[in-house]
From Swiss-Prot:
The keyword Protein transport does not apply. One of its GO terms (cellular component) is nuclear speck. Its main location: cytoplasm. Interferes with CBL-mediated down-regulation and degradation of receptor-type tyrosine kinases. Promotes accumulation of activated target receptors, such as T-cell receptors, EGFR and PDGFRB, on the cell surface. May inhibit dynamin-dependent endocytic pathways by functionally sequestering dynamin via its SH3 domain. Exhibits negligible protein tyrosine phosphatase activity at neutral pH. May act as a dominant-negative regulator of UBASH3B-dependent dephosphorylation. Residues 238-303 form the SH3 domain. PANTHER family: UBIQUITIN-ASSOCIATED AND SH3 DOMAIN-CONTAINING BA-RELATED (PTHR16469), UBIQUITIN-ASSOCIATED AND SH3 DOMAIN-CONTAINING PROTEIN A (PTHR16469:SF7). GO terms for biological process: negative regulation of T cell receptor signaling pathway; regulation of cytokine production. InterPro entries: His_Pase_superF_clade-1 (IPR013078), His_PPase_superfam (IPR029033), Phosphatase_SH3-domain (IPR051710), SH3-like_dom_sf (IPR036028), SH3_domain (IPR001452), UBA (IPR015940), UBA-like_sf (IPR009060), UBASH3A_SH3 (IPR035634). It is found in: Cytoplasm; Nucleus. This is Ubiquitin-associated and SH3 domain-containing protein A.
Length: 624
């Protein structure tokens, strides 16, 4: 061990010479890790165990930033426990289910006591001592009951803390800042704003009433033991999005990330120019390595999911010596990020009743197209010299519908692949299992959309009961079709002849001839709004779900008019819809009490799968 490292370690040990806890650094040094990286690993895992820090170091062995002197960022929060926490967690769950995710869902229920600040890795234990001393100083004057006053505005909902209890909490935050400055050389800015516990922030205005009703179920008088909790985060990724891997992924190329289920990945939305459609560039939280990853293997995680809880101080005058040990060992034994456990969700029967008791609109993207897999020349690959169709690969459909102008018209109106048909059937089967009641079906005139609707209805056992209403107004933005000479949809008669149960009597909001190649973005969102108005007026007024099968763009342009939201910016719109996978869904429910629609969880889970590349057995034989 270098002399400088020995001196640094001695300084840390001497500063806390009175502590009885054994050093966590010695085992790491004995394993051969340098002092600075060992201290970095201890700080990143909450200084819980040497084993956790060693695991972190092994995981980050190829981390290019391992030797960089980048400290963690820390913050102190006042967190509720007990019955009050259970009620707050129930609000977190229900508000997200009924009103979609808002900024408050990114973090657990808390009162912020100070801004985030940095602390050198070798001084983190001094920070723990500062927390203990500040807590002991205020323990006798900390309020036995913290009154919470509900406050609501058009973009904020939360509890305010007023009067003398707020003064006592501020005094504690100031004491912590003072102790940390002396012991750990940290500059901490205690919170100067009115103390508050946020319930919802930056939500859609039409959700305000629902959120207020949910908040009224939280009784501030619920029993609660307040705990001061010290958390840390990686300061480099504050403005990144956090993704969570749903499945294992083994890299196919050297520049791809290895993923294990549960891994977190940091993604900078502004630095994705190099990534192709369906991929992202990210940095693994587990390894620190950078690379490409398939987006459909991940889901959005909460900001605080990667935060690490270090130590807590519980305010309780009756605390004995055993319970005070909570301060010494209050975070997870494995050093993993802290995620508050949620109370059990409502029963499946209650969820089903809630689903079928409202009128709903389910917007679904079509399944996988043949040209998505085999490229623009797919038609040449499956056409004989005399213009007949044959199946060169199992992912080509068994047959194609007859068209009056021949097979060439499929070039601009491709069918579903075999996998696309399977996707549609899988979604239909899941809808059947969920118990929802589909009462009407609309589809874009594109063959892939009508096919998807047909296969979903077949799995729902409704293919003979419900007719597909073809609505040209929900076809995708014509700007994306500008390279195609003309749109060549199958006529209703051709669809009928091909055994599609289409409604020949339905009068669409817009005729096919209204789809013009020079369409602007404003014209596109306007025709979608007009079409949705017609669909809503045409749908049965009784309870049930109207199924709309269209394109990825429809998940945005067909739902925002329902929700009363203005059109998205054109650039944001294009970036958003390119990431929507096959059979992606958005679900809107009508709230008849206020005559508005809410965006809620779809009745079925998402569909995710990997690629299956082309294989030639001749090449395999010759390689031997």
């Amino acid at each position: 061990m270098a002399a400088g490292e020995t001196q640094l370690y001695a300084k840390v040990s001497n500063k806390l010479k009175g502590r009885s806890t054994p050093s966590l650094l010695d085992p790491l040094l004995a394993m051969g890790f340098p002092t600075h990286t060992a201290l970095k690993a201890l700080a990143a895992t909450g200084r819980k165990t040497a084993e956790a820090a060693a695991d972190w170091l092994h995981g980050h062995c190829n981390d290019p930033s391992l030797d960089d002197p980048i400290p963690q960022e820390y913050a102190l929060f006042l967190c509720p426990t007990g019955p009050l926490l259970e009620k707050l967690q129930e609000f977190w769950r229900e508000s997200r289910r009924q009103c979609a995710k808002n900024r408050a869902h990114e973090v657990f229920p808390h009162v912020t006591l100070c801004d985030f600040f940095t602390c050198e890795d070798q001084k983190v234990e001094c920070l723990y001592e500062a927390l203990r001393r500040a807590g002991d100083r205020i323990l006798g004057s900390f309020p036995t009951l913290v009154p919470l006053v509900l406050h609501s505005s058009i973009s904020y909902l939360g509890f305010f803390i007023n009067d003398s209890p707020a003064d006592a909490i501020r005094e504690f935050a100031m004491a912590f800042a003072t102790e940390a400055a002396v012991l750990a050389d940290c500059t901490i800015k205690p919170c100067t704003k009115q103390l508050h516990l946020t319930l919802a922030h930056k939500f859609y205005p039409h959700h305000q009433r629902t959120l207020e009703q949910l908040a009224k179920a939280i009784q501030p008088s619920h029993s609660c033991q307040w705990t001061a909790a010290l958390y840390s985060r990686d300061m480099r990724f504050v403005h990144y999005q956090t993704l969570k891997a749903l499945f294992q992924y083994k890299p196919q190329n050297a520049d791809e990330l290895m993923l294990s289920a549960g891994d977190y990945i940091f993604v900078d939305p502004t630095q994705q120019e190099e990534a192709s459609e369906g991929w992202a560039i990210g940095i693994s939280h587990r390894t620190g390595c950078r690379g490409f990853l398939p987006e459909n293997y991940t889901e959005r995680a909460n900001e605080a999911d990667t935060w690490v809880k270090h130590r807590t101080y519980t305010f309780n005058l009756a605390m004995d010596l055993n319970s005070r040990k909570d301060f010494e060992a209050s975070c997870r034994g494995n050093g993993e990020p802290h995620t508050p456990s949620m109370s059990k969700s409502v029963s499946s029967i209650q969820a089903l009743q809630a689903t079928i008791s409202r009128r709903g609109i389910l917007v679904v993207r079509h399944g996988e197209r043949v040209d998505q897999v085999f490229g623009k020349s797919w038609l040449q690959q499956c056409t004989t010299a005399d213009g007949k169709y044959y199946r060169p690969d199992l992912n080509f459909p068994r047959s194609l519908p007859r068209r009056s102008n021949g097979i060439k018209d499929f070039e601009n109106d491709p069918p579903l692949s075999s996998c696309g048909i399977f996707q549609a059937r899988l979604a239909g089967e899941a809808l059947l299992d969920s118990g929802v009641r589909v009462t009407a079906v609309f589809a874009s005139p594109a063959l892939r959309c009508v096919q998807t609707a047909k296969h979903i209805l077949e799995e729902l056992k409704l293919e003979k009961k419900l007719k597909i209403r073809v609505e040209p107004g929900i076809f995708e933005w014509m700007k994306w079709e500008a390279s195609k000479a003309t749109l060549t949809f199958l006529t209703l008669e051709e669809l009928k002849e091909a055994n599609f149960n289409v409604d020949l009597d339905y009068r669409p909001a817009l005729p096919r001839c209204s789809l013009m190649p020079a369409e602007s973005y404003d014209q596109y969102v306007e025709r979608c709004a007009v079409s949705m108005g017609q669909i809503i007026n045409t749908c049965p007024q009784d309870m049930g779900i109207t199924l709309i099968v269209s394109h990825s763009s429809a998940l945005d342009s067909c739902t925002r008019p329902l929700l009363g939201l203005p059109p998205r910016e054109c650039g944001d719109f294009a970036q958003l819809v390119r990431k929507i996978p096959s059979l992606g869904m958005c679900f809107c429910e009508e709230n008849r009490e206020d005559g508005k629609w809410d965006l809620v969880n779809p009745p079925v889970k998402t569909l995710t799968h990997g690629a299956n590349s082309v294989f030639n057995w001749r090449n395999w034989i010759s390689s031997n």
